[in-house]
C-alpha cells in the first residue's frame, strides 16, 4: 500500500530550495563570528531547516545522493571548534572603504578557548574582496601552544556554488602557517 495514500502531506513540491554560493558562506562565517563574540548573551543559535529547504544540505530529487552547500562548512567548523570561552581579540588590521558603512577592518575575527582540550581556535574572515590579508596572532597568554591545523575556505569566484558531484567550495588544510617564538 502506498504510504502517500494515508499521508499525502509527506510528499511536497520542492519549495525554497535556495542554492548558496561562496559569498553566502562568507556571510555565514561573519554571522557566526558575531554570535560567538556575543556568546555571553546569545546562549543558543540553531538552523531551523537542515535539508533542502533553505538549508546547508541538499538532496537529489531522484534519490541520487546529497551534497553540502557552501554554507555548510562555516556551521560545521563553528560547531566543532567553537566550544569553550569566547575571547575578544584586539584586531589591528588594514582597512578598506565600503559604500554603506565607511571604513571597516579587513579582518573580522574571534577566538575560542577550549580549556578541556587545551585548544585555542581563531575564526577569521578576510573582508577585503580585492586583496589577500595576512593574519598575525599573538598568543603569549597560551605559552607552549602550537598551530595544530590551519583550515581555509576560499574561492576566487564569489558566485561559485556546490552541486551534486561538484564540491567547488570546501575547506582545505593549508601549510601557509608560520609560528614565531
Model segments located where?
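Aromatic/acidic polysaccharide-binding cleft in carbohydrate-active enzymes
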Residues: 2-109, 115-118
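C-terminal beta-sandwich/jelly-roll accessory domains of carbohydrate-active enzymes
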Residues: 93-94, 99-106, 125-181
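Conserved active-site loop/cleft motifs that coordinate metal ions or position small ligands
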Residues: 44-46, 123, 151
Amino acid at each position: 500500500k502506498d504510504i502517500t495514500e494515508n499521508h499525502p502531506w509527506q510528499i511536497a513540491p520542492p519549495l525554497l530550495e535556495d542554492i548558496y554560493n561562496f559569498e553566502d558562506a562568507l556571510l555565514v562565517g561573519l554571522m557566526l563570528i558575531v554570535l560567538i563574540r556575543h556568546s555571553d548573551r546569545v546562549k543558543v543559535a540553531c538552523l531551523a531547516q537542515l535539508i533542502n529547504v533553505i538549508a546547508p544540505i541538499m538532496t537529489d530529487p531522484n534519490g541520487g545522493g546529497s551534497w553540502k552547500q557552501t554554507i555548510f562548512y562555516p556551521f560545521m567548523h563553528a560547531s566543532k571548534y567553537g566550544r569553550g570561552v569566547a575571547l575578544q581579540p584586539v584586531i589591528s588590521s588594514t582597512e578598506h572603504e565600503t559604500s554603506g558603512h565607511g571604513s571597516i577592518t579587513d579582518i573580522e575575527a574571534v577566538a575560542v578557548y577550549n580549556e578541556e582540550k587545551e585548544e585555542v581556535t581563531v575564526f577569521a574572515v578576510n573582508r577585503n574582496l580585492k586583496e589577500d590579508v595576512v593574519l598575525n596572532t599573538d598568543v603569549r597568554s597560551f605559552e607552549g601552544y602550537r598551530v595544530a591545523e590551519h583550515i581555509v575556505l576560499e574561492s576566487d569566484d564569489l558566485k561559485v556554488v556546490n552541486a551534486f558531484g561538484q564540491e567547488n567550495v570546501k575547506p582545505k588544510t593549508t601549510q601557509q602557517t608560520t609560528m614565531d617564538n
